[in-house]
Amino acid sequence: MLRLPVSQSNTPTTPIIVKCPTCKKEVEWGEQSPYRPFCTKRCQLIDLGEWAEEEKSIPGAPDLSDSDGWSDDMGY
């Protein structure tokens, strides 16, 4: 188990550093980094755009059901 040094206020005394998912710049995880885990609002919006354009996705089984009403055979 990882133990970090703790101050009297029960918060880690050494900052936790993570890499921005977009540009890989190091970001300190804390209140001073409002866009964490991103380094800036720009990197946050780039990531959002990648999800919106379906450049990123969470793997899963495809939905092959015809219950959406968009099948090729419309019945007429």
Curated annotation (Swiss-Prot):
Biased composition regions of type Acidic residues, renumbered to the chain: 65-76
One GO MF term: DNA topoisomerase type II (double strand cut, ATP-hydrolyzing) inhibitor activity
Signal peptide coordinates: none
Keyword terms: Metal-binding, Zinc
Keyword Amino-acid biosynthesis in annotation: no
Metal-binding recorded as keyword: yes
Binding sites annotated in the UniProt record for Zn(2+): 20, 23, 39, 43
Cofactor requirements of the protein: Zn(2+)
GO biological process annotation, one example: regulation of DNA-templated transcription
Region Disordered: start-end pairs: 54-76
Cofactor mode of binding and number, as noted: Binds 1 zinc ion.
The organism's place on the tree of life at top rank: Bacteria
Functional summary from the UniProt entry: Inhibits all the catalytic activities of DNA gyrase by preventing its interaction with DNA. Acts by binding directly to the C-terminal domain of GyrB, which probably disrupts DNA binding by the gyrase.
UniProt similarity note: Belongs to the DNA gyrase inhibitor YacG family.
Assembly notes: Interacts with GyrB.
Protein name: DNA gyrase inhibitor YacG
Organism from which the protein derives: Photobacterium profundum (strain SS9)
Gene this protein is translated from: yacG
